[in-house]
Amino acid sequence: MKALYLLGLLAFLYSCSSENVYDLQPESSEEENPGTFLEAIQEQSRTCVPRDGDCTENRKACCRSKIFQDRCQCRKVSQDKVACSCKQPYWLMKIEEILGDIPEKPKPVEGKCVKKHHDCSQRKNDCCPGSMENYTCKCYNTLEEGAKESEICGCVSKADHQILAQGFRYVKRLHDLR
């Protein structure tokens, strides 16, 4: 099991390092019109080379597969000619076969999602994604005045859930001691 976690961590780190990194400093010709620099990046991300397509002109333009980005692999055709095509390394292909299809999140109602720490009791599957991890709707039983139990729900991360659950258990224990 530890080996599987290690393999997953290595695959995640490798995929993070494979993403294209753009220099955010505009070049001298682009200083006059800053919109062209962003437009060029957006156009480059829209036009990617599919698997087995020719990537001789732009070796960083290979499309992403389900999880990982394909690599441009070149081979010598003749003395002075090189042919390049987008391929996926064998071990990355095997990792994708093991992991299978990654299910997509259900679309939120009316194009909006429930923000972090907001009430999600009506829409439990529509929490907004976070920057580092996804939020899930968790519900907690609370004691109101008069020892009446009620349930509150909110979109929280895993760490927030552990902290909140421990806090509610602690308060309930204090209430039971009275």
UniProtKB/Swiss-Prot annotation:
Disulphide bonds in the chain: 48-63, 55-72, 62-86, 74-84, 113-128, 120-137, 127-155, 139-153
Keyword Secreted found: yes
Keyword Hydrolase tagged: no
Locations listed in the record: Secreted
Signal peptide start-end: 1-18
GO cellular component: extracellular region
Post-translational modification (record): Cleavage of the propeptide depends on the processing quadruplet motif (XXXR, with at least one of X being E).
One term of GO molecular function: toxin activity
A Pfam family annotated for this UniProt entry: Toxin_35
Propeptide regions on this chain: 19-46
Keywords associated with the record: Disulfide bond, Secreted, Signal, Toxin
Motif (Processing quadruplet motif) on chain: 43-46
Tissue: Expressed by the venom gland.
Listed InterPro entries: Spider_toxin_CSTX_knottin, Spider_toxin_CSTX_Knottin_CS
Top-level division of the source organism's lineage: Eukaryota
Recorded family membership: Belongs to the spider toxin CSTX family. Double-CSTX subfamily.
Entry function: Spider venom toxin that exhibits cytolytic activity by forming an alpha-helix across the membrane. Lethal to insect larvae.
Record-given protein name: DELTA-miturgitoxin-Cp3a
